[in-house]
Amino acid sequence: MGEYNNKGIVVAGGNGQGNKLNQLNSPSFIFVDEDQCVYVSNGGNHRVMNWRKDAKEGIIVAGGNGEGGNLNQLNSPTGLSFDDEGNFYVVDCWNHRIQKYLIDI
């Protein structure tokens, strides 16, 4: 078995807990696509964010309109997944639903 470098590199957040575009609050799940974009379920901020490779801040791709049950809101997203048609799905935990989005970044 090979050796590992045990020094991590911050690829999203890392600027303390908060709701600015360069911060996360209770991230719970990530997905990394073929372009090395990192998608983060950011439960404490009720949003899903996309961090492009080497970005200093993320882009809100779902939620981000406060905690709530409207279609443009999330309540503690805890997971996400993608299909092969360009849609992504968010586990909207405390709204007891799965939301589907077409991503266009």
Residue ranges and their predicted role:
Residues M1-G2, N50, K100:
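Conserved blade-register residue in beta-propeller folds
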Residues E3-S28, D54-T78, I105:
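Gly/Pro-rich loop segments of beta-rich domains
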Residues V32-D35, F82-E85:
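Residue-level detector of Asp-centered blade-edge/turn motifs that repeat once per structural unit
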Residues V38-Y39, F88-Y89:
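Conserved beta-propeller blade signature
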Residues N42-G44, D92-W94:
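Conserved strand-to-loop turn within each blade of WD40 beta-propeller repeats
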Residues H46-M49, H96-I98:
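Structural signal for beta-propeller blades
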Residues E85, C93, K100-I105:
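Long terminal segments
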